Amino acid sequence: MKTRTIALLLALVMAVCCLTGCTSTRVRSYSEESSDASSDKYAAAMSAYKSNKKVMTIDGSPVYWNEYAYFLCAVMSNIERYGTQITDWSQVYDESTGKTYADLMTESVVNNIAWNHLVEIKAAENDVTFDAAGEQYVQDTIDQTIQNVVGDGGTESELNEKLKSYYMDLDLFKYFTKMQYLYNALASKLFGENGANITDEQVQEFAEENDYMTAKHILLKTTDDSGSALSDADKAAKKQQAEQIAAQVKAVADPDKRVELFDQLMEQYNEDTGEASYPHGYCFPSGSMVTEFEDACKALEPYEVSGVVESQHGYHVILRMPTQGDDLVVSSDGSQQTLQMLVAQQQLGSLLTGWVDEAEVTWEPKFRSIDYAAVFTPKESFWKRLDVFDWFEK
């Protein structure tokens, strides 16, 4: 399959993260769309065929309608979110290639599906098995999702109903979660546990290309536990304390001794309770921290300490640290992974892109040319777009 499409790789992570607390790549449910007509359209696509209707195979791995419909709805949702309304699927969207919106949709959906299936295929080829730990990972994810989406005492049956508004059912959600586990396991097999086989040179190249940096800080908050601002007098006292901390650290020239002192002062004064989970400091890409903190970090060399930096959170004293492979990367969903593992996942992603390009796609006869206008037509007008035999056959 030698095709490249627009960058709409929603991938398996989106299906899982959108329901387990991740906010950075969340797929909205169709009930969050702007109109009832839009909701009806997505519901129509999901039920256009039986969920277990075979659509195609990818390198021999079968793909069923529930998976195809999920990515179909997710890609459509993203297209519409950026202001494009497709009214004519035969309209050419790329004059240089002559490809239509129907071509765009098919290529985008197939590439996303192929990504998932090739994770499973390549895992098997590399003796990566879905073991008891994988089963537990899936069950833990389901339990957490029930807690988040259904509530205390919720059941898998209730979760299955909720999942319909995210273009999927429980079986598909379990499959995506399994693929997420296999993806991480395959990365560990190819690149070492937590990316241990990734070299320092590869880490530094990745950090520079993607603007990652690492820093420790001591935060003196200018709000109380309820979020209310401190008095001007209390703020002034906090600022003076921050200035004294900065001066004390700057007075130590030896890098190792400076870090040792900074750690001691962190333990004594730091009011950022989350930093304890990052023993080497926060490792983060540009754009993920408040501007004042990030700008101050960029201005520092490794082991250099800032003056007092004020942000909405309070007064910071920042110690820039060298970025290393075992640094824990800040994640929006609270999960942790090393920078080495992040590099390993990127390299696995590059491998998967090549495998997707080379994959053999074999369509079931009915789906060789999908009428997307008919698929997205709500049931009350379904008969106008698909013949009666197709209706009975689904």
Residue ranges of predicted features:
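Short, low-structural-confidence N-terminal segments
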Residues: 1-103, 107, 358, 362-394
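PPIase-associated folding chaperone regions across multiple families
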Residues: 24-50, 158-237, 288-394
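Charged, solvent-exposed helices and adjacent loops that form client-binding or oligomerization surfaces
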Residues: 74-105, 124-206, 232-237
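Peptidyl-prolyl cis-trans isomerase
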Residues: 244-293, 322, 328-330
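A mature extracytoplasmic/lumenal domain signature
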Residues: 60-62, 67-69, 132-134, 219-224, ...
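A generic structural-conservation signal
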Residues: 5, 132-134, 275, 306
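Acidic surface patches and DE-rich sequence motifs
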Residues: 94, 224, 270, 284, ...
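Solvent-exposed, polar/charged alpha-helical surfaces in well-ordered, non-transmembrane soluble domains
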Residues: 66, 70, 107-112, 116-124, ...
